[in-house]
């Protein structure tokens, strides 16, 4: 019995593709271009898992399909290779993170090649390669020149025991560090910031121009968080000081009964009374120990301290107490709020807790019982009484501007991008700080500023990165003898991934980031496929850098990625006990179709869950390729369900995909192929070409594969197979199962050439309709025969065919036919007596 021998066939074709540079990017000016991009991976020590190939297979199917359609296709792969795990590994082992990273990349590349992806490896990029990060640094120097990169004192998550600051994501909910479990404190430190806020409006508006999932656009809109309102100035009683609050509801100013400053607000120390100084200092200390996330948790208890100072409400001259509370963040808005407890839940709870006034200014509800957060006519509001929300806002803004105590303001939730890390393993920031107090960017002709090699990667202890320990690299002298010190912060991992798609277009250019004509030819990216977890940060940062490069005249488009698609997650199998606790798969046994805990004997419930090392349910693609073959893995992952759905991995499903490929192999290697078309498969073949073509375009790969299965079933019922249909079918399955298709193609075409550039099959519209139909023959109202006849046969012809049928003749023998009623394409009714 013949079957698809993946262990022989797959390596053979992978070698052929590599040797012949089959997937080198086309440069034919007569052809249209298609750019298919994957989110490049961080090369971790764990290697690929089966979730990675889902997105990669999708872009690969599109790339192979477009090549066959006559496109130049750019389908590259590279490595987002700076990152914290490599630095931690280096600190733990004393090994060079570059060596660790290189080993991981080699392993990832081996795994990727084993899956038969049609990448153009001549365009491979690696964010840790100085020839690559020369241009990451170049972009930074341009941002610096334009005033979009600047230094600021910013509170960071400082861990004294680790001698370094850590990212928000590395702080555990209990306020300790993920690594080591040490206390984390908020400490102001000099940091580099990028002024992404300068692009807020464009980042928002240009979302209308791209074909992205609406859910992702909404996440970006919410992150940018545009709101229209007013800035209002509050004077502080008995001082010449004031502070500004931003509010989206200036119409409720008459209901502002207290103000709250962030504990870090510049004014706090200078306005605090002597009696309150101790309480304020202690509260500030406590707040510094909490993360922003913990501080703004809606469910947490309301805490705060009165400063002893009062502000003057500008609309009615009333004195209102100024408090500090940790739910107000210095980094958000102006770091100060006016509180209207009658109409805001958080303000109401705070006011109730501390016995502060609650004055309703909107009609409706009982504000002693609960805040009223609906709209209503204004009350207790002097010149706004009786007005609705829109009218009142407009009137109040006009009043504030007229009286010089406020103005209309558009505000954004978006903050500037904290761009520096106190780490070794990142791109050096190309800035020198001179002893005369000035700073300059490293000149372009001296880029890249190469990350110095060191075997001693340990925190400096001062809050600077380990680069501060490397004095030979650190200290520089200008031609005029002025001494300087290099910037010791490095860039975040986001830097290299914010522009990598541009470098793929021209990866070996030493003179510029990429050639303008090539950028014009390939941008924007036609399809970008990756996980939804990058919905906000990576995609927003890449859009920001792209717009900046557009303003510089480097790139020709406003947006980088025309179409974005998020593949779903491949879930593992997990088991839960009666308490809902997860049980690792190696502690589970299967008996009589049920699952039991090996140690306790308790019956367990099976449920899908995210693959994780702790649950021991991670599936390694190497094992799947070894047992079933790469084509099986590709077909299975595309057939599991819609590309954007999250679906549980199933061994049975994998076996089903393997059986399908074996059936394809048998059909095309054992069925007699003929040059004469009997017409039996005309409809199903043309339907298959049409469906597969349309569904690949729409990324509906599961239904495309289902149609291929329909063709195989139909072809298996025939004694012979028309050779042109056999060839067309192999071309249709090639994007999904390329190794199998190449092997079968050589048997059919015998050209020695790859199937990759053979023109995609077309379908004949006229063959999509049936040429024959089945009709029923009724005698005395009962069905006595079913006949296949030509479609649209005339009633008289239909009658002839029915009466000539042997079965019908036997039924009416010895009887007189009184009447025959013929309905084309449906039935013949014979009345006898």
Curated annotation (Swiss-Prot):
Lineage, broadest ranks: Bacteria, Bacillati, Bacillota, Bacilli, Lactobacillales
NCBIfam families the record matches: leuS_bact
Stored PROSITE patterns: AA_TRNA_LIGASE_I
Location(s), subcellular: Cytoplasm
Principal location class: cytoplasm
Pfam family, one: Anticodon_1
Organism annotation: Streptococcus suis (strain 98HAH33)
Ligase recorded as keyword: yes
HAMAP family: Leu_tRNA_synth_B (MF_00049_B)
Top-level class of the enzyme under EC nomenclature: ligase
This protein's GO CC annotations: cytosol
A GO BP entry: leucyl-tRNA aminoacylation
Segments carrying motif 'KMSKS' region: 610-614
Catalytic reaction list: tRNA(Leu) + L-leucine + ATP = L-leucyl-tRNA(Leu) + AMP + diphosphate
Binding positions (ATP): 613
Keywords: Aminoacyl-tRNA synthetase, ATP-binding, Cytoplasm, Ligase, Nucleotide-binding, Protein biosynthesis
Protein name (database record): Leucine--tRNA ligase
Family, per entry: Belongs to the class-I aminoacyl-tRNA synthetase family.
Superkingdom of source: Bacteria
GO molecular function, one term: leucine-tRNA ligase activity
Motif 'HIGH' region, residue numbers: 41-52
InterPro entries according to UniProt: aa-tRNA-synth_I_CS, aa-tRNA-synth_Ia, Leu-tRNA-ligase, Leu_tRNA-synth_edit, M/V/L/I-tRNA-synth_anticd-bd, Methionyl/Leucyl_tRNA_Synth, Rossmann-like_a/b/a_fold, tRNAsynth_Ia_anticodon-bd
Entry EC no(s): 6.1.1.4
